């Protein structure tokens, strides 16, 4: 076997960290780009040839015609939305790379979307903040062994099996939420039509990825959302329904963990969060409003304004531990230009005691107060910086403090949305 050259890129906060920008950057070097978790609830924007492209489930490598993009078995796939997304990208004039889809990936179906919306509405004041795209119910069905996988469509008795599950889901929606039924034949026809568009892409992607790595290919694993939204290690219950940490790259792809040799955690220079859940460093003032506007902190899918706060290193160190992060990449550093005083949370205060971890329960996390380190900001425009040495002293100190407290090397930072506004301080792929 040749030398392993693989890299996992994961978000190290609550999502929206700029993973798409980094996976797009590394996709220029990679031979294969793999999505290993999540569904089309995690939109990100890629700037390519002067155009902005919003992608949700398709790996970022699709914009490089020399790259093979893989949707792994850990993903939840809405085939109809996938086909629409591919058509939109094609119609913009982009020459697409090769796409492979795991035959073991779970399918998001129309009843999952209905259940997602009905469940969220029924929670009242205890809403989780789901995007209502059917992700949670899809993973619920997976665990309950009611899920339908891509490979199942080729089974001879698929229509009968699908109809049985469909009728069960309709009964559940009617009895629990009084939701009107949808038509089975139309749902089935739409699913088959979408499948026929992509069926040549369907394969055992685990075998493909394993062979690519063993043959010396550069393989990039693209995480979705963020480590703090992980179903096991995130800020439960305000999490997503899949494992978003880097440790799931092997399980969600179908390869050995021994074939992955580097993990990059992408983190904003500040913190953001969407929906409910504890946020000890949240800024509910003009400073936070300014960061939101300069950073364009609105959901790429939902357009919802994101909650904004100071950088939380307690949360970041939690992500580093649970994902085994080797390097950090800091995004949106330019957004902090002009902020006179910068605060970094290095520990929490819970019931008068200092702690350096995220409590397991949301009630205790809500009670945590942030303990801050104060650092002077910088006024200079850094959007044209090409090297670390060109940064203002205070910006250098800010990055160095993050690396010092987290005990993880920073491999680069971004000073704007364009691919060329990416500064690499250490090559890791």
Curated annotation (Swiss-Prot):
Q: Which GO terms describe its molecular function?
A: adenylosuccinate synthase activity; GTP binding; magnesium ion binding
Its UniProt pathway annotation is: Purine metabolism; AMP biosynthesis via de novo pathway; AMP from IMP: step 1/2
GO cellular component: a single term: cytoplasm
Keywords assigned by UniProt, alphabetized: Cytoplasm, GTP-binding, Ligase, Magnesium, Metal-binding, Nucleotide-binding, Purine biosynthesis
Catalytic residues, chain numbering: 16 (proton acceptor), 44 (proton donor)
Q: Where in the cell is it found?
A: Cytoplasm
Enzyme class, top EC level, equals ligase
Entries under InterPro entries matching the protein:
Adenylosuccin_syn_GTP-bd, Adenylosuccin_syn_Lys_AS, Adenylosuccinate_synth_dom1, Adenylosuccinate_synth_dom2, Adenylosuccinate_synth_dom3, Adenylosuccinate_synthetase, P-loop_NTPase
Q: Look up the record and name the cofactor or cofactors this protein needs.
A: Mg(2+)
Q: Subunit structure, per the record?
A: Homodimer.
Q: Which family does it belong to?
A: Belongs to the adenylosuccinate synthetase family.
Q: What is this protein called?
A: Adenylosuccinate synthetase
Organism the protein comes from = Mesoplasma florum (strain ATCC 33453 / NBRC 100688 / NCTC 11704 / L1)
């Amino acid at each position: 076997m040749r030398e392993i050259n693989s890299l996992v890129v994961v978000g190290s906060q609550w999502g929206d960290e700029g993973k798409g920008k980094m996976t797009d950057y590394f996709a220029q070097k990679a031979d294969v780009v793999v999505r290993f978790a999540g569904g089309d609830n995690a939109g990100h924007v890629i700037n390519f040839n002067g155009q902005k492209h919003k992608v949700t489930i398709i790996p970022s490598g699709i914009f490089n015609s020399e790259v093979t993009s893989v949707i792994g078995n850990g993903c939840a796939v809405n085939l109809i939305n996938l086909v629409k997304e591919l058509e939109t990208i094609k119609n913009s004039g982009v020459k697409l790379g090769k796409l492979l889809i795991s035959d073991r990936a779970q399918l998001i179906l129309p009843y999952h979307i209905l259940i997602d919306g009905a469940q969220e509405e029924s929670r009242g004041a205890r809403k989780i903040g789901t995007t209502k795209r059917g992700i949670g119910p899809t993973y619920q069905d997976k665990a309950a062994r009611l899920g339908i996988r891509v490979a199942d469509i080729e089974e001879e008795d698929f229509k009968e099996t699908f109809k049985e599950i469909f009728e069960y889901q309709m009964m559940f929606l009617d009895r629990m939420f009084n939701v009107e039924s949808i038509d089975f034949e139309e749902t089935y026809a739409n699913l088959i039509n979408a499948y026929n568009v992509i069926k040549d892409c369907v394969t055992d992607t685990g075998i493909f990825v394993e062979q690519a790595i063993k043959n010396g290919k550069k393989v990039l694993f693209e995480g979705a959302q963020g480590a703090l939204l992980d179903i096991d290690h995130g800020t439960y219950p305000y999490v997503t329904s899949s494992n978003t940490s880097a440790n799931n790259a092997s399980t969600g792809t179908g390869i050995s963990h021994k074939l992955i040799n580097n993990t990059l955690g992408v983190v904003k220079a500040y913190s953001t969060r969407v929906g409910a859940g504890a946020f000890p460093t949240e800024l509910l003032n003009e400073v936070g409003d300014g960061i939101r506007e300069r950073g364009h902190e609105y959901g790429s899918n939902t357009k919802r304004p994101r909650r904004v706060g100071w950088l939380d290193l307690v949360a970041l160190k939690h992500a580093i531990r649970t994902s085994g992060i080797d390097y950090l990449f800091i995004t949106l550093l330019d957004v902090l230009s002009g902020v006179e005083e910068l605060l970094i949370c290095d520990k929490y205060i819970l019931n008068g005691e200092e702690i350096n971890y995220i409590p397991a329960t949301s009630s205790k996390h809500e009670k945590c107060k942030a303990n801050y380190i104060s650092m002077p900001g910088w006024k200079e425009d850094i959007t044209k910086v090409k090297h670390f040495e060109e940064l203002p002293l205070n910006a250098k100190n800010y990055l160095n403090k993050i690396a010092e407290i987290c005990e993880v090397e920073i491999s680069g930072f971004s000073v704007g949305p364009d691919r060329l506004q990416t500064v690499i301080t250490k090559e890791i792929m």
